[in-house]
């Protein structure tokens, strides 16, 4: 038998006060704790390791629910133990009062006539008997193997005997504890559910604002400088999301100002060079015929072309260009333009299609792609038209990796073996004109099926995807291939196939 006791000094004459000098109360055997005296908490692990992507609202809800559950469990244990200890203290006080009354009756009448009181009970716990032998009145709580709690109270008599009183923890007290536990469980569940709902509500609001901020930032990145992230997220409450939005807006404004300043400087320099270069070319044409004159004319023409290209890039960067739309038959248009430009280039019209586009800008894109293939690739150069898709392929070393990863960039040729063979403006202009047309310009390298990336490319393909509908604005730049999307049409399937084969080559 195990338990705990509370001792009291015995009284000699009736009515003598007694003191309570025993050890402090024990929490009792009814405390429901796990191993080591702590409740066991099971966690969920491996979400990041498994690559599971969850929304902010669910993370916040789970965190609030977990904290609420832990707090509810801790408070429930504290309340349960406090209630049990309080009820045991009341039961011990009652047993102590009853044994004191039984002692007085026995000493007054000389016989034991109090219910449930016994003299020299052989079942008296040894721990309680030792306290009684010390001349003190005491109470003791023990627990049977079957979980039933017993309450003992004993007092030494003047004649040397020991009077004890034994009672069980009443069913009524057990029912009260059971009802209390049930109320605590219901309250804990309500706290967890309420916390989860609150987490979903708060997290959903925050997640929505973050999604709107991300969408607005993507619009700014795609070429819409007038979009403001702070205006996009809205809301009356000011929090960290507003700080992020203001920081993104400030960064976008600073970048836009720098880009605009760079564009203006480039345009001003090119414009200032245009007049003297034209004069130089005119003067070179007046020189007497001969090899030196041809060299001067060739370099003067190259300089004029460079100046014109720089001016065109500056205009395209200003996002002020507008397409002059016409309805054309794409296959026939490409065939006639390529034949006039370079009859040696093979043109195949797989599927004819009528498109609404700007013929001048489309011709500019097509000629720049052909010039790039002729300059940096190897023959034969092939052009194919399939619906709204134009492909230009050569059999050279392929595009450089940085071009495939980042897109065309001015004054970057992308390969050391082509030093001095270009300024990196051809594909930059082609990409800018494609943007004005609302088209998409993509690049990829051709390798044998299943060949690793280090195997040299067997050719390069530039693909122009004309839009199904006529462009209504020029605020977005052409995108590189999106490997996560594929369509049902043959052109969409081809785009997915091209994007999966990797990218590499020239500017």
Curated annotation (Swiss-Prot):
It is found in: Cell membrane. The gene is cseC. Its EC number is 2.7.13.3. GO terms for cellular component: plasma membrane. Residues 204-260 form the HAMP domain. Keywords: ATP-binding, Cell membrane, Kinase, Membrane, Nucleotide-binding, Phosphoprotein, Transferase, Transmembrane, Transmembrane helix, Two-component regulatory system. PANTHER family: SENSOR PROTEIN CREC. Residues 268-470 form the Histidine kinase domain. InterPro entries: 2C_sensor_his_kinase (IPR050980), Cell_env_sensor_kinase (IPR053469), HAMP_dom (IPR003660), HATPase_C_sf (IPR036890), His_kinase_dom (IPR005467), HisK_dim/P_dom (IPR003661), HisK_dim/P_sf (IPR036097). The modification Phosphohistidine is found at residue 271. GO terms for molecular function: ATP binding; phosphorelay sensor kinase activity. It comes from the Bacteria. PROSITE patterns: HAMP, HIS_KIN. SMART domains: HAMP, HATPase_c, HisKA. Residues 25-37 have a biased composition (Gly residues). This is Sensor protein CseC. It is a multi-pass membrane protein. Residues 1-42, 472-507 are annotated as: Disordered.
């Amino acid at each position: 038998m195990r338990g705990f006791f509370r001792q009291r000094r015995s009284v000699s004459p009736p009515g003598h006060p007694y003191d309570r000098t025993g050890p402090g109360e024990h929490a009792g055997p009814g405390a429901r704790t796990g191993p080591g005296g702590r409740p066991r908490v099971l966690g969920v692990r491996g979400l990041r390791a498994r690559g599971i992507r969850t929304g902010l609202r669910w993370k916040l809800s789970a965190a609030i629910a977990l904290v609420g559950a832990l707090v509810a469990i801790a408070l429930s244990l504290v309340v349960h133990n406090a209630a049990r200890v309080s009820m045991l203290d009341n039961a011990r006080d009652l047993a102590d009062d009853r044994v004191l009354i039984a002692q007085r009756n026995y000493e007054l009448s000389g016989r034991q006539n109090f219910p449930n009181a016994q003299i020299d009970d052989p079942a008296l716990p040894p721990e309680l008997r030792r306290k009684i032998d010390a001349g003190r009145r005491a109470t003791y709580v023990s627990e049977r193997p079957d979980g039933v709690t017993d309450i003992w109270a004993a007092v030494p008599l003047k004649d040397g005997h020991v009077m004890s009183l034994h009672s069980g923890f009443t069913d009524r007290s057990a029912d009260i504890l059971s009802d209390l536990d049930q109320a605590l469980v219901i309250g804990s569940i309500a706290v967890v559910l309420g916390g989860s709902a609150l987490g979903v509500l708060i997290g959903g609001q925050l997640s929505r604002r973050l999604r709107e901020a991300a969408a607005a930032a993507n619009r700014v990145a795609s070429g819409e400088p007038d979009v403001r992230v702070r205006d996009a997220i809205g809301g009356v409450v000011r929090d960290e999301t507003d700080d992020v939005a203001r920081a993104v807006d400030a960064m976008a404004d600073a970048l836009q100002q720098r880009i605009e300043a760079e564009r203006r400087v480039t345009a001003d320099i090119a414009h200032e060079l245009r007049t003297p270069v034209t004069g130089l070319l005119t003067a070179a044409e007046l020189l007497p015929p001969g090899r030196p004159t041809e060299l001067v004319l060739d370099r003067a023409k190259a300089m004029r072309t460079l100046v014109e290209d720089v001016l065109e890039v500056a205009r395209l960067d200003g996002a002020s260009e507008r397409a002059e739309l016409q309805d054309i038959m794409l296959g026939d248009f490409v065939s006639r333009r390529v034949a006039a430009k370079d009859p040696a280039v093979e043109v195949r019209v797989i599927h004819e299609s009528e498109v609404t586009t700007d013929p001048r800008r489309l011709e500019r894109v097509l000629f720049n792609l052909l010039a790039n293939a002729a300059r940096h690739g190897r023959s034969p150069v092939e052009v194919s038209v399939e619906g709204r898709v134009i492909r230009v392929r050569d059999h050279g070393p392929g595009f450089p990796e940085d071009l495939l990863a980042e897109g065309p960039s001015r004054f970057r040729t992308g390969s050391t073996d082509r030093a001095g063979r270009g300024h990196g403006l051809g594909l930059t202009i082609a990409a800018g004109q494609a943007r004005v047309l609302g088209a998409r310009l993509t690049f990829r390298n051709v390798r044998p099926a299943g060949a690793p990336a280090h195997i040299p490319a067997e050719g390069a393909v530039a693909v122009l995807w004309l839009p199904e509908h006529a462009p209504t604005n020029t605020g977005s730049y052409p995108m590189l291939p999106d490997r996560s999307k594929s369509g049902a049409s043959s052109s969409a399937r081809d785009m997915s196939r091209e994007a999966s084969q990797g990218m590499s080559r020239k500017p």
